[in-house]
Amino acid sequence: VYRTSDLWCPMEGVKEVSPRVYHAPQWKDARLKPGTVVALRTYYRPAPGIFLSNDKDTRLQNVKVHYAEGMGLLAQLCENITLDEFSVCLRGDKDPRYFTTQADATHFSSCRGKIDSRNGLYEGMMDDAINVHGTYLKIKQRLDDHTVIARYMHPQAYGFEWGVNGDEVQFVRSATMELTGGKNRVKEILPNDKDTVKGAKEYRITFAEPLDAEITDKEGFGKNRQGAEHLRP
């Protein structure tokens, strides 16, 4: 429905009473008026249209994604991405679909360098046109002046490499989002709850410089790997 949030349409008790006619006893939202087109979908996102990981200097040109069971383009841990005439769009006025992707048209996680999107069209997606973000780890334990145990906290953000030796990071106080201390560099990072990075939620991280005394697990500190320096929509 135009200019509204998602409508909740419970499927419990829905019965077909005649061909193409259904009784939905729990559809009681006042915005569901006769003539309203309802696009039913799940919130699962099993696969993006295009997936990039650990790539460098990638260029996607004259590409159209008309539908995907997730993001249109999902990129993680990449450096320098150019989208020229890259579109997430319907096939035209006669396209029978009402939406293109289950979530964002394009989504960039923990990328670095320059992200350039030009001459494209993003329409019909169920969330953002362009979403660019890093990924925080929360400090769970301070082992010494150089080493911490840190953990992915969001259920959709784990199982991929958070950082590598030499990466620059910044500490952030979670309650206020204020920067704390200066930047530091990763000397060593190892999965702590798994034998491999795949599936790991916790890391043991040793830093090159001593940590500020106030950085502990008591108040809730996170750290963000330094990501994309330039974004051009």
Question: Which residues does each PLM region occupy?
Answer:
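Extracellular beta-strand-rich solenoid/capping regions of secreted or surface-exposed proteins
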Residues: Y44-K56, G70-C78, A105-S109, A228-P233
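All-beta strand scaffolds that present successive hydrophobic residues in beta-strands
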Residues: D57-V63, N80-F86, K114-R118, P233
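Glycine-centered loop/turn positions within well-structured domains
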Residues: M71, I81, D128
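Acidic/polar low-complexity surface segments
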Residues: V1-P46, E85-F108, D127-A157, W162-R232
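Phosphate-binding glycine-rich loops and their immediate beta-loop-alpha structural context
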Residues: I50, V63-V65
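Repeat-solenoid scaffold signature
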Residues: S110-G124
